[in-house]
Amino acid sequence: MTLQNFYRDTWAEINLDAIFENAANMKKHLPPEITLFAVVKANAYGHGDVEVAETAIQAGAGYLAVAFLDEALALRKKGITAPILVLGASRPEDAQIAARESITLTVFQAGWLEAAQSFLEGTVLTIHLKCDSGMGRIGIRKQEEMNEIERFLQKTKCFVLEGIFTHFATADQLDTEYFSKQLARFEEMLTWLKEKPKYVHAANSAALLRFPNAVFNSVRMGISLYGLSPSMEMKEVLPFALRPAFSLKTKLVHVKNISKGQSVSYGATYTAEEDTWIGTLPIGYADGWIRMLQGQEVLLEGGRSPLVGRICMDQCMVKLSREFPVGTEVTLIGKNGTECITVDDIAEKLNTINYEVTCMISSRVPRMYLKDGRITGVVNQLI
């Protein structure tokens, strides 16, 4: 495999076939009339926004979703023409640019609509209403709020109400009591509207995988699009296998033998108990490979070796079982021979969730895109 467009031997590999397969399998899992929203916020959970967006659309997604307007505008600038929903709050003064770029905004206050109207200047903005059914984040909570919004929309032609949605807080937990309360609350909220809009969506990855009765007519596919389970609890109850798309790799840039009693890295936290081969890897906490990963195993030629000493900003060190040549490929996340380190393994080490692991691999790390076993593109945001 030839490395292209970057000058440090550290990169992430994104398997677009896996993205396609996950989206296509989800489409098969759902009734054919359901619209799939592919969630590509946070640079597609660290996988690459435009590449994932294009692949998801090819697999049958009918809509894209991002966190804030900047992310939507970035997709437009990169040539994405599919509908895009901004899930988070936006400023009223930015309504015009959203309307001009055919970007759908989330709304949950009549006052926001009134303020945004003055900025639209004849353009029409498509909106989805957000309901807070129990997440406690943003959204309409009371019927009076919904009625006030509906009355305002009836007297203006500046807005098109296209959708309404909520977000489940506990759909990834086996205990369904709170989920059921939220679902019932959202169903009640839907009765507050005189007429339902085109899209009604509540199900995130966890809900759409587990609760087909909660999908309404649209769903938002986030973490499962990337081949990752919404939670460790859910891994055993998935209706179909998810295929992880993310791998993280580097290469040995230096190999040396240190004597018994010699130490490695800041703080001298690792001291060799015997003569030991040490390799240096060009990845560190500025790349998202944070200091808490000291002691984590990596894969070389199908075997496991631990990281020793503190992880530095740009480099870290690995204890080798023998002398390996400089340039040997090292897998931090992914498969190497018969061994595999998963995103979930790293999340467990860090006492966090798989979402955070892929999101925290920084823009310093180039993304290499693979399709049919071939490199189809490399994105290096530094150059």
Swiss-Prot record:
The keyword Isomerase applies. Optimum pH is 8-10. Its cofactor is pyridoxal 5'-phosphate. Pathway: Amino-acid biosynthesis; D-alanine biosynthesis; D-alanine from L-alanine: step 1/1. It holds the Pfam family Ala_racemase_C. Catalyzes the interconversion of L-alanine and D-alanine. Does not act on other amino acids. Homodimer. This is Alanine racemase. It comes from Peribacillus psychrosaccharolyticus.
